[in-house]
Amino acid sequence: MSKATAGPERAVSGLLSVARLLEEPRLARLYSFVLREGEVTIDEITDELEIPRTTAYSDTGTLVELSVLARDDDQKTHTYSAVPITLTATLDGDEYTVTPTLVDAFGRSPHDRDLDLLVEKYGLGKLAAALTYAVPYANGNMSERVAARELDLQYAFGVAVLQALRDVVHEMESVDPHFEDIRDAREYPPATED
């Protein structure tokens, strides 16, 4: 690759890699697991995620091709480690950064009824918005009542989503090197119509 095209090619490839993680919860879950664990083998992946060995090989291969996992071939038993991702998008002056924490939340959705329903009914954007409220909620800086109301979800459902995301926040805060880039809803109040 020439130096003149390295930046744009790398940027667009990174964009497509993040998009793929946010399209396939199974890949997102695997990526997040490897990121949390640091360095893993196929056996550890199959044991912990309870997926077939062929699926583990196929999915790790896909993630290596996407450059979000690195494979160490120096040992007899190959190990995999995650490459921390981040993607910042700006639309009409509004900026949002996708970090491994959102990828983890999405990867958990098929295994968590509340997150699954949120994504199915409202889409990935609502999950991203909920995460911006879950961070201050999980850290005790926002009540669940305020967070649920601001998310514009039925109260009990909003609280259930926040509680599911609280676990994501607590587990990813020390692992996600871009955690501080997650928007905090307290700093960006909802837009009001004129």
How would you name each of these model-derived features?
Residues 12-27, 41, 74-95, 183-193:
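Short, cationic-aromatic polyanion-contact patches
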Residues 51-62, 154-163:
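Short amphipathic alpha-helical interaction segments
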